[in-house]
Amino acid sequence: MSDLPVLFDELPTACGGRIGVATLNAPKSLNALSLEMVHQLEAKLDAWAVDRSIVAVWLEGSGDKAFCAGGDVVALYRSLTEEGENRGSGRDSLLAETYFTAEYHLDHRIHTYPKPLMVWGDGIVMGGGLGLMAGGFQRLVTETTRIAMPEITIGLYPDIGASWFLNRMPPGVGAYLGLTGAQLNARDALDLGMADRFIPRERRSLVLAALTEANYGDRSGAALRAGVQAALDRHEERATAPAGQVWPHIDHIQALVGAVDAPTAVARILADAPEDRWLAANRARLADGCPLSAHLVWRMLERHAHTSLADAFRDELVLSVQCCRHGDFVEGVRALLIDKDKSPRWSHPDAASVPEEAVQALFVSPWSSEEHPLRDLGLGHRGG
């Protein structure tokens, strides 16, 4: 297979059109999303959007383990540690600014894409991978799907638009997922509105064949969507999806995080002694996670309960860059992915010890509103 970071193909359809296929091509890193991948994807999506022969787009990952396991945080770590040695010293964040700006712009583009865009969410779909998947017209999950937003383990928070879409879940569920980095299966994704259809992995080639044979009518937006839906209808098997993990525990989850502040929610989860293995794993992940991140999870969900998706991305860009400059992100990545000692030295011992000023400082924008890199997001064609 080619060593290009993203592979592009166009499948001819029976109606004389073509289906654009984009494949993330870094299986050794579980298709971790690099800046080069982001640039190539957006450029091709822009071209396909105005190419009348393209009737639909299919996005997938290479290999059999992951669609995309997240953003390329190792590259970010290396740039930050090369540009500013001391933790919390105000690192030079040029790559971070460039990367997050491009990533969020691409994610927003997918949310607002004018043609039906399908995401084959097979295997691991985490962090930046979920950012690519969340805005798809049809988000397809399989028996191997594992979705999570585990940013609390590296001193970050659920970004990639999660500040907006986690708020669209049942009360408390988004906060719980963000605090614990809980892993979700296909049924959970369907139950929580993070996926649209369950299709067994073995049917991938059959689904693509059905899409090439579909009727796309007059190629209006409605006709393109109808053609895709009809093709997918033939292969959906929702009844065979694995049993969910969230819905059986939703009352318990809501009792843990409902009507409280971040330190109280964290304390309740850590004091819980669940017999269920999934709940216990979530508790353990929070116990090892970044205390400052717990506050960021909570604060971002509060700030974006009623805002637009574009506003959420703008706020996330500020927070993500500041986490790289001043927060625990570098230490979290070091402990988990570089030295792999899994013993991060967080800035604060627990959530109750995090002062309000430490949280507020990370929300101070390094740009004026006129200089914000995503100031035009949502206002024109390029931003969706």
Language-model features, listed with the residues they occupy:
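Glycine-rich beta-to-alpha active-site loop
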Residues: 110-154, 177, 181-182, 186
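Amphipathic alpha-helical blocks and their helix-capping loop/short-beta junctions
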Residues: 200-286
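Long, low-complexity C-terminal extensions of enzymes
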Residues: 265-281, 286-384
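Glycine- (often His-adjacent) and acidic-residue-rich active-site loop
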Residues: 61-102, 155
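Contiguous mid-protein beta-loop-alpha structural module that forms a pocket-lining wall or clamp
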Residues: 161-163, 168-224
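Conserved CoA-thioester-binding segment of acyl-CoA-metabolizing enzymes
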Residues: 1-60, 378-384
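Hydrophobic/aromatic residues within transmembrane alpha-helices
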Residues: 59, 72, 132-133, 188-189, ...
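Gly/Pro- and small hydrophobic-enriched strand-loop and loop-to-helix capping segments
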Residues: 136-159, 193-208
